[in-house]
Regions:
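N-terminal cap/lid segment of alpha/beta-hydrolase-fold proteins
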Residues: 1-28
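Active-site glycine-rich loops that stabilize anionic/oxyanionic intermediates
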Residues: 35, 39-43, 118-119, 251-252
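Conserved alpha/beta-hydrolase
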Residues: 45-78
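Alpha/beta-hydrolase active-site loop
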Residues: 84-104
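Alpha/beta-hydrolase fold nucleophile elbow
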Residues: 107-118
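Alpha/beta-hydrolase-fold enzymes
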Residues: 124-210
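Short beta-strand/loop motif that positions the catalytic acidic residue
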Residues: 247-249
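Catalytic active-site module of serine/aspartate enzymes centered on a nucleophile-bearing elbow/loop
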Residues: 272, 276-311
Length: 311
């Protein structure tokens, strides 16, 4: 099945960036719904092209944007991994809502499903706490559980920002946030072995300048804020109780603490009275499920879940 690509731009809610986005629109087929992709840290929407092709072949419009500080939504390379002088995490959430508004204005009356991966899942979890009633479901891929040290990370990032400036790039902060990720995969070939068991995908990630960069200290502060907020019981209790939510994670994903953190997040949601929460853990898979060796299985599971909750 063929599809058309429509590009769009809009002013970020931070009033500083022009945000670049794409829609993948199936041609000559009855449209079933919309899947909006919220990409992860050090990614961009084009990384999801294979996933988008699969979904469009099954009648779904796919849309997404390069988030602030990523891909084509930067003012200069100096702004890679930088969101705003203050409260950048809030603008990430609002920009995702703007994308929803853009695509639903063009294609009204279709169910919208939000797919968030990694950092994008943190954003998505905050999004559904504020705008959950606009969605028909959400898929949370490679997410994280409660992290008591997130608040300490925010304080350290603030301190570094005051001393070095908000655009400073700290290997120390990176090590605190992600250095642990490769430990289970030693001896590692690259510092990104943890993202996927498919070595070709890892090497593509390493070679891609749009993926292989270090966040600013300000960006890390916003990341830690998202981690703290998305696991906050106060935030979770504002999610619509009947919103269908599908957690997916690899059993060897260090971000999800090898599934333990994800299961804690699922428990938080169920304890808050959310009645339509499902979770699937994929044995031996790592962080980027949609790029894993069994990605076709993952794609099919997502499609089947969407079609089931759409009935």
């Amino acid at each position: 099945m063929s599809f058309e690509i429509e590009e769009f731009t809009f002013e970020s809610s931070n009033k500083l960036n022009k945000i670049y986005g794409k829609m993948y629109i199936p041609v000559d087929v009855k449209l079933k719904g919309i899947v909006q992709i919220c990409h992860g840290m050090c990614e961009y929407i084009d990384k999801y092209i294979n996933f988008a092709k699969f979904l469009t072949s099954n009648g779904y419009i796919v849309c997404g944007h390069d988030q602030i500080g990523h891909g084509m939504s930067i003012n200069s390379d100096d702004n890679l991994g930088y969101f705003a002088p203050d409260n950048g995490y809030k603008y990430l959430i609002e920009d995702a809502k703007k994308v929803t508004d853009i695509v639903t204005e063009k294609f009204p009356n279709l169910p919208v499903f939000l797919f968030g991966h990694s950092m994008g899942s943190f954003i998505s979890r905050c999004y559904i706490a504020k705008y959950g009633e606009t969605l028909s479901g959400v898929i949370l891929c490679g997410t994280i559980g409660p992290q008591p040290l997130a608040r300490a990370g925010i304080k350290l990032a603030n301190l570094m920002s005051e001393r070095k400036g908000s655009h400073y790039r700290s290997k120390q902060l990176y090590n605190i946030a992600l250095d642990f990720a490769n430990l289970k995969f030693l001896p590692a070939t690259t510092r990104f072995d943890w993202i996927c068991s498919d070595k070709d995908e890892v090497l593509k990630h390493v070679a891609d300048k749009k993926c292989n960069f270090l966040f600013t200290v300000s960006g890390f502060k916003d990341l830690f804020n998202l981690v703290s907020l998305c696991n906050s019981p106060k935030v979770i209790k504002t999610i619509p109780k009947d919103l269908p939510i599908f957690f997916i994670s690899g059993s060897l994903d260090p971000i999800g603490e090898n599934s333990l953190g994800v299961k804690r997040a699922v428990k938080l949601y169920k304890d808050a009275g959310l009645s339509k929460v499902k979770c699937k853990i994929y044995p031996e898979d790592r962080h980027e499920l949609i790029n894993e060796k069994n990605k076709k299985e993952v794609y099919e599971d997502i499609l089947q879940w969407i079609e089931k909750v759409s009935k």
